């Protein structure tokens, strides 16, 4: 089944895969318009949750929440987002992306309006859940609209921009949040979110994507696999998002959730393994090449948390608020945008693996620089390292996906769902896992350093004896200073851990690259 107009297109203009729009040779003004809509959709997919995540403490106070309740807001977003690609890829192959995007944006819009009218914790959770559901089609819209903006020989650049530009949303949110909150507290954040959704919805209605080739892909078993996988992955997100705050072994629901998630995911995988035309191509997913791709994607996602968990937490530990870090995040935002642009200009089939390796190397250097931080370190001392991380994050994401995409082209379009779902899960669960890992590691190391520092306080030393004689207030001040120093030392340990993982990831990527080069040379020798 094809949309009208496909048959009249030139071969190079036709959709590359079912569900992907055609790419006609538009005039430059039309290409520019498509590019603007693509950038808008890409930023809308990330800006809403970025504004909420960086302002959790303000929202927590406004809604009267405790830290555990507030942390559910970003967690719920990922709970709905993590599995959405599982259904989105087939939906757009059968019905088109535009319908799915309109449904997702419509629900998202209604949720934001309802929250602005009603307020409260339940409606805030609903907004974040709707935002996660809408983020998947918005990301795809960003890719497809930007594809229309580039000529055929530069279309890889569209992927780099579509995945790199949204990464600037978090530093931009940190940069502008203090001023936005002064205008109208947290309601201003939701008004911006509402404006972005309305603008994106209007843009995709005014400028439609070209037609696509549609195929009948849904089967009854898909509607068994998807709920099993979606609920299982959502439970994993809940555990990883809340485990450190409620503590892994103290909350009984964590063990129950993990057990249920394991049963549901295993049941879904067993069902998929025995299907003739599975939703997930598990036999391909178990090949060495695919496992290598997943390892690169997941480990790089883990080490990128050096910025969101390590540097941000360190600055909080030394008493830096949002006002003191605005210039730092301006630098990070600029570096992220620069990384997306440089990546777009240099990307090609020959350079994607080397771009990934360069990004990982930059992260390793940044972690090494940050591991020397102390109690005198302030935002200006982090400009270089955090700029490296921002640049690397924007340059790594799309080339990593393109590594898998080249395997899909060799295997067939029916494996496309497997690639997109696996990549999405590696990034979303990888982000939550890295956050849980690094925060738990930091907490454990802070306790170790605190005990060590307290153990070194000899009551016979003059300055210690003076504090002890000064009364409870002076003792409390001494304990607070020890806590602060322990946290700083613990964050240095986090940076060292990231450095070690980055080096191991770089070695793994180098091995993957050498294997890929060897395969290409072997194929060339075998060719007649």
Roles of regions detected by a PLM:
Residues 75-90, 139-143, 330-342:
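Central cavity-lining transmembrane alpha-helices of secondary-active solute carriers
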Residues 59-61, 91-92, 176-184, 240, ...:
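Interfacial helix-cap and linker-helix signal at transmembrane-aqueous boundaries
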Residues 1-47, 61:
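Cytosolic juxtamembrane N-terminal segment immediately preceding the first transmembrane helix
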Residues 85-224:
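Helix-loop-helix hairpins in multi-pass membrane proteins, especially solute transporters
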Residues 32-47, 52-54, 67, 74, ...:
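12-transmembrane solute porter fold
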Residues 166, 178-296:
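Hydrophobic transmembrane-helix bundles of small-molecule transporters
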Residues 17, 405-407, 422-528:
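Hydrophobic transmembrane architecture of multi-pass small-molecule transporters
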Residues 55-83, 123:
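Extracellular/periplasmic helix-loop-helix junction of adjacent transmembrane segments
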């Amino acid at each position: 089944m094809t949309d009208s107009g496909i048959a009249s297109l030139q071969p190079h203009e036709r959709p590359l895969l079912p569900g992907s729009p055609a790419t006609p040779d538009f005039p430059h003004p039309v290409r520019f318009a498509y590019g603007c809509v693509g950038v808008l959709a890409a930023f809308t997919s990330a800006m809403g949750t970025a504004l909420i995540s960086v302002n959790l403490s303000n929202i927590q106070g406004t809604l009267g929440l405790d830290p555990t309740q507030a942390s559910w807001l970003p967690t719920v977003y990922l709970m709905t987002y993590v599995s959405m690609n599982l259904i989105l890829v087939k939906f757009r192959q059968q019905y088109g992306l535009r319908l799915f995007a309109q449904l997702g944006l419509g629900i998202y819009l209604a949720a934001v309006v309802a929250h602005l009218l009603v307020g409260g914790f339940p409606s805030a959770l609903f907004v974040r859940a709707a935002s996660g559901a809408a983020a998947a089609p918005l990301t795809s819209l960003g890719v497809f609209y930007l594809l229309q903006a580039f000529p055929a020989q530069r279309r890889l650049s569209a992927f780099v921009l579509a995945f790199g530009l949204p990464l600037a949303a978090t530093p931009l949110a940190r940069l502008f949040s203090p001023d936005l909150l002064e205008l109208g507290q947290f309601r201003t954040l939701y008004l911006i979110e509402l404006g972005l959704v309305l603008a994106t919805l209007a843009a995709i209605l005014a400028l439609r994507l070209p037609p696509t080739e549609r195929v009948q892909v849904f089967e009854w078993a898909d509607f068994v696999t998807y709920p099993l996988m979606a609920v299982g992955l959502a439970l994993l997100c809940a555990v990883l998002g809340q485990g450190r705050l409620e503590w892994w072994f103290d909350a009984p629901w964590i063990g129950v959730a993990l057990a249920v998630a394991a049963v549901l995911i295993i049941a879904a995988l067993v069902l998929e393994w025995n299907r003739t035309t599975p939703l997930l191509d598990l036999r391909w997913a178990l090949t060495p090449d695919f496992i290598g791709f997943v390892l690169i994607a997941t480990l790089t996602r883990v080490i990128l948390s050096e910025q969101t968990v390590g540097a941000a937490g360190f600055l909080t530990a030394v008493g830096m608020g949002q006002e003191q870090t605005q210039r730092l995040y301006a630098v990070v935002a600029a570096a992220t945008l620069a990384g997306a642009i440089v990546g777009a200009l240099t990307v090609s089939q020959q350079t994607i693996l080397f771009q990934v390796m360069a990004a990982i190397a930059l992260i390793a250097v940044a972690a090494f620089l940050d591991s020397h931080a102390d109690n005198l370190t302030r935002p200006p001392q982090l400009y270089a390292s955090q700029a490296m991380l921002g640049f690397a994050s924007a340059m790594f994401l799309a080339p990593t996906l393109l590594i898998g995409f080249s395997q899909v082209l060799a295997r067939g379009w029916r494996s496309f769902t497997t690639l997109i779902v696996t990549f999405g899960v590696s990034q979303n669960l990888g982000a939550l896992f890295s956050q849980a890992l690094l925060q738990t590691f930091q907490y454990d190391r802070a306790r170790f350093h605190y005990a060590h520092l307290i153990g070194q306080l000899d009551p016979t030393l003059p300055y210690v004896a003076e504090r002890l004689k000064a009364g409870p207030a002076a003792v409390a001040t001494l304990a607070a200073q020890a806590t602060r120093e322990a946290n700083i030392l613990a964050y240095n340990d986090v940076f060292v851990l990231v450095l070690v993982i980055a080096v191991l990831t770089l070695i793994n990527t180098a091995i993957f690259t050498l294997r890929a080069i060897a395969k290409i040379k072997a194929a060339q020798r075998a060719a007649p």
